[in-house]
C-alpha cells in the first residue's frame, strides 16, 4: 500500500515490517558459520512476530526444503543477508568509534528493532535515545522484557513519528544539545519524502555541537534510473511471490513504501554545514568486509551510499 502523509504502523505492517526483514537478516547472519556481526536478539524479535516475508531470510531451511523456489531467489536472499550484515557492522563500528572518542550521548532515529542499546559494550554514563512509532517501540520493549534482556546503557524510549516535532520530544526527555552526540539514521531516508529528508538533517545539525558524529545510509546517484527501477521492481515481485508460496501469506510491496524523489546529496550538504563527511558505496562496503559484490543491478537492494561524518571544533 502506498504511503500517506499521516500513516502509522505496527511491527508487522507497512514500514514496521521492514524492521522485521532487517532483524531476520541479522538473525541469519548471527547463526551462520562465520558471522560478521552478532545480534542475540534478532531471532527473538522474528520468533515473536510469527510468519511473514521476513521468514524467508530468517529460516534458510525453508528455502532448502523448496528447491524450485530456492533456485529462483536463493542467491538474492543471500545478497540481502550480506548487505544487512555489512550495514549492521558499519553502524556498529561507527557507534563504537564515537564512544572511543568520548561521546556519551547517542540518538538512534527510526530505531525499529535496532538492539544496540542492549548488545553493544557502551562506556559507563552513556545515554541512548531511541525514537520510533509508538507501537514499534512497544513491541520491542515488551519482547526484550519477556526474555530478561537488560540495556547496556541508560535507555530512553521516545515514541514519536519523525514527521512530527521530534526535537522537542527529545529535549523534553533530557537530551542535552550542548553535549556531543552520535546520531544514526539507518535505513530511514528512503522512507522519507525529499523535503522531510532535508528537514531531518537540518534538525540534527541544529542539535549538534562540535564533537558530534553522524552516520546514515542514503540512495546512491542514479537510483531513479527508469530501467534500474523497473528491473528491481520485477526482482522484488519474484521475491514476494516466492515468500508467499513458502509461508502462504500475502506480502506487501516494500518498494511502494519508498519515496522515489530526487534528493539533496547528504555528504555534500553536511560538508557545507561544518561537518567532515565521507561516503562509501554498498559495493565498497561489501568488499571491505569480504562479502561478494553482486555482478548486476537487479538485486533486492538498490544502490546505496553509507555516509559518516564528524563535526570538528571550529
UniProtKB/Swiss-Prot annotation:
Keywords: Methyltransferase, S-adenosyl-L-methionine, Transferase. Pfam families: LCM. Its EC number is 2.1.1.-. S-adenosyl-L-methionine binds at residues 132, 161-162. The keyword Chloroplast does not apply. It is an enzyme of class 2 (transferase). GO terms for molecular function: methyltransferase activity. The keyword Cytoplasm does not apply. It comes from the Bacteria. Residues 291-314 are annotated as: Disordered. GO terms for biological process: methylation. Belongs to the UPF0677 family. Exhibits S-adenosyl-L-methionine-dependent methyltransferase activity. This is Putative S-adenosyl-L-methionine-dependent methyltransferase MUL_4402.
Amino acid at each position: 500500500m502506498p504511503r500517506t502523509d499521516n500513516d502509522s504502523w505496527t511491527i508487522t505492517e507497512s514500514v514496521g515490517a521492514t524492521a522485521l526483514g532487517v532483524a531476520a537478516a541479522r538473525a541469519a547472519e548471527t547463526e551462520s558459520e562465520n558471522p560478521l556481526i552478532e545480534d542475540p536478539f534478532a531471532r527473538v524479535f522474528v520468533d515473536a512476530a510469527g510468519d511473514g516475508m521476513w521468514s524467508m531470510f530468517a529460516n534458510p531451511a525453508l528455502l532448502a526444503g523448496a528447491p524450485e523456489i530456492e533456485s529462483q531467489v536463493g542467491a538474492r536472499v543471500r545478497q540481502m543477508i550480506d548487505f544487512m550484515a555489512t550495514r549492521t557492522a558499519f553502524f556498529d563500528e561507527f557507534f563504537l568509534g564515537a564512544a572511543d572518542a568520548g561521546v556519551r550521548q547517542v540518538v538512534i532515529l527510526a530505531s525499529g528493532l535496532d538492539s544496540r542499546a542492549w548488545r553493544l559494550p557502551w562506556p559507563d554514563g552513556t545515554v541512548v535515545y531511541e525514537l520510533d512509532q509508538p507501537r514499534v517501540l512497544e513491541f520491542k520493549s515488551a519482547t526484550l522484557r519477556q526474555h530478561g534482556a537488560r540495556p547496556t546503557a541508560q535507555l530512553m524510549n521516545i515514541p514519536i513519528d519523525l514527521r512530527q516535532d521530534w526535537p522537542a520530544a527529545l529535549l523534553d526527555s533530557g537530551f542535552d544539545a550542548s553535549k556531543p552526540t552520535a546520531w544514526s539514521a539507518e535505513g530511514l531516508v528512503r522512507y522519507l519524502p525529499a523535503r522531510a529528508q532535508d528537514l531531518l538533517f537540518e534538525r540534527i545539525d541544529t542539535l549538534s555541537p562540535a564533537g558530534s558524529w553522524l552516520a546514515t545510509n542514503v540512495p546512491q546517484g542514479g537510483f531513479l534510473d527508469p530501467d534500474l527501477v523497473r528491473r528491481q521492481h520485477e526482482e522484488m515481485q519474484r521475491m514476494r511471490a516466492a515468500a508467499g508460496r513458502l509461508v502462504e501469506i500475502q506480502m506487501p510491496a516494500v518498494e511502494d513504501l519508498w519515496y522515489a524523489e530526487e534528493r539533496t546529496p547528504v555528504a555534500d550538504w553536511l560538508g557545507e554545514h561544518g561537518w567532515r563527511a565521507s561516503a562509501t558505496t554498498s559495493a565498497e562496503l561489501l568488499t571491505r568486509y569480504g562479502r561478494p559484490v553482486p555482478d548486476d543491478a537487479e538485486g533486492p537492494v538498490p544502490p546505496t551510499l553509507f555516509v559518516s561524518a564528524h563535526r570538528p571544533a571550529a
